[in-house]
Amino acid sequence: MKNKQTPYKSLISGHRTSSKFDSTIYFREVELVDTSPVERFISQRELLTRILGREDDSDEWRTKANLVIIGIVSGVESYFRSIIRRVLISDDDSRAHSYKNKVSYGAVLFHLSHLLPEALLEDCTFVSKETILKNVNNFLGLSINPQQIPALDAALDEFERVCHLRHCIAHRSGLLGSKNAIELGLDKFSTYLEKPISPTLDSVNNVFNICQNLVLEFNDQIFDRIIIRSIPKGIWTGDLRKDKKTFTPLFSIFSPTPNDRDELRKSYRSFTDHFGI
């Protein structure tokens, strides 16, 4: 045997193509359409539905189904980031509550001012009941007890189950792992351990509905609590002509039809009539 040998390399895996990550080819400078976070979520659901198309019994369709499940959960996370950012820009109480939160030096240097609040959320996730409630409280000063709001509590529980499904797709190539099976209910799901997720069109639509229900429930809760929190300030007159400057920005943040003037008037009147303003 020779004293000096070149390192053994079998190349058992076969031929490979040399490739280097070039970040410049993945992004474009585009101007996003200014719309409300809930409207953007609904539009994303519609887009994902079109991408999924008609159900068929093929690996290709099931792969698309898995990918749109990841996409809709991502849409929920994007909703929370966007709504928190928009509220921090517009609502004085929320902004004051977030003064103590930290943002990276790089974000301060390079973020546009209207996007800077979103940099606060870089280390946050919105894939469980605990983290969603914690982040809404930490950044907006809204302490929400879901046990007092059955519809919201149910929406959070269902979404958390969807997130376990998403975890299997994103991190285990669509196979059900033991940890996720335990969270979903091991007695019920033990027979599916290490077996592939096989979604149907109905099951994907069920995931879409669960995600949308959570977004709509939270959208209502955050709007209601912010506007109720403002009442003691005595800023509302009961006359939309006088209150439009304050009410319109809030309506535009939370409404799925932010440019609908009839809905604006209806929402304002519902608020003032309820509180006798």
Where are these regions (language model features)?
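Charged alpha-helical initiation segments
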Residues: 1-74, 78-85
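Generic alpha-helical secondary structure signal
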Residues: 39, 153, 157, 202-205
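Charged, amphipathic alpha-helical oligomerization/scaffolding segments
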Residues: 47, 71, 161-168, 206, ...
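A generic secondary-structure signal for well-formed alpha-helical elements
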Residues: 76-83, 87, 91, 173, ...
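Polyanionic, low-complexity intrinsically disordered segments
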Residues: 1-31, 36, 175-277
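Histidine-centered, metal-coordinating catalytic motifs and their short helical/loop contexts
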Residues: 155-183
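Helix-loop junctions and short alpha-helical segments
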Residues: 55-165
